[in-house]
């Protein structure tokens, strides 16, 4: 009997290679170059001789878009809510669909090794669509009988073998939830973006953004940043006064804090400082000494959100870059799957195995050996979200193997794992209360008695705050008494870490998509990242947009509130769990957003009043460059994104190619429309070619595509 043929598909070529090394006997297999490599070996499958073929895709096989007639920006955006959509290959040049079809010919089984999240489940069905028609059909049962799903959370021999021995079936409900989200985000995002972009870029020249985009997740994300900006701008600092006293013990000065903290009236502050000064000669008497033993609990197991927060605040790595590095470490087999909401180890999780793996590491091996020798209390806290186990190291790596940010992230993940099963941090606080006249002051000291997890998680270390020993009733000399003045200060701008926390709390995006939404508001020039703390400062454009949605009474404020997206995410979860129909959820939200869009377009003038107060009209922006072929007057070149030419006389705007330099081309004119040609080039050594602004925007011949009219 001939061996059965098994086709296996992973999400990335590197993952297919890593999995093949673990599955093939002795890690030996042959590789054939193709669109993506195909690894082959012989073994057994379900107790039968088998021939394995392992290949991959490169993420989504298909992308969702509108049908051809709706791709023009001249279409009424309101029609997009009911427009037909089509899935087309994400990368047509790769011809991944054809590759999968060829690979599936004559196969008996299809085993799907896509990432174990909703996006991965959606890609499973994209792969099935291409492979199933070309496979051998089973003699008994339906066509899907021999389509199997591998569930795994780490690229280790144990995890992969376990997945191979416990193959299940792909989850269509989760895939349909992704379909619903894709269609909703496409239609809502494109409709609002096209309308906003055309309206505002047709009127203002200094917006400095290629598109004025709207996104159901992106806009509430921006709204958090602008809300903090508004609090800062609206903050009114208030002066306050406090009494500061300094005592001495053994000739060492010790500063005391006033228990009243501060008052907001200078005269009252002066009264208190005079009262204390009058009794200065009597000294400061120790009234009470309060000693407390305290502890700081070890952290929960690491999930995606906490990893993103620390990368931004502690390592200075952006959320999108953090996820990119984490995915690479996962694919290389150094860490478990990095997209998870779970912060609790499963009951059967092999904590000892991970500790043993890391026990020979020169940086933290001794911590692991101590825990293995002396034992540890298994963690019980955290949240089990039912998706993937927490993020943990899966193999040992040294700095020389990884280097740079990859090492810094790996170092954090390993240390957090060790810290999560280490004892808590224990310390003692001493609070000494002094009486000076009728006023009370204090000084505080801290002493760490057992560093616990902070020994390995060094960034959490609590420093000792030394104070001398005091006795109750002891009287100490007062060196000085002063009235100090200060002002209340506003909150600071949001950090990326704080924004991630707000997004998680309000249900904006998922652990996988949060980095994308933050990156989008940066790329759109709505916020700028500032300083080592990675604080998000809204630009004028970002501020005006959110103010337009929220503050104009005629505009719908819900467009920028987190509650809208949170409602959408809840319904998508119901689709994923099989409790709601894909079509019903999609129809409900599309109708709702269509009504909001129609209302928004009718009231856009109210929002325009804010833009008018903040930005310059096209006619007042840019510099004269080339002559219009219609009125023969100079058009102004606007270099800010998107770069374009504007004729104030004709009130016409002409788009130009992006990411290059524009200058006048020898004062030559286009023979078709008499517009002066401009030269587009991509740098000092880049290729340059002349363009007619009119032909570039209005192709003169049917077979010419808009944006390709070189002269």
Give residue ranges: language-model regions:
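Phosphate-interacting basic helix/loop segments used at nucleotide- and nucleic-acid interfaces
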Residues: 85-110, 224-225, 310-311, 411-418, ...
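Structured, non-catalytic alpha/beta "coupling" segments that mediate domain-domain communication
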Residues: 33-67, 219-264, 364, 418-466, ...
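A conserved hydrophobic secondary-structure block that centers on an alpha-helix together
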Residues: 115, 314-318
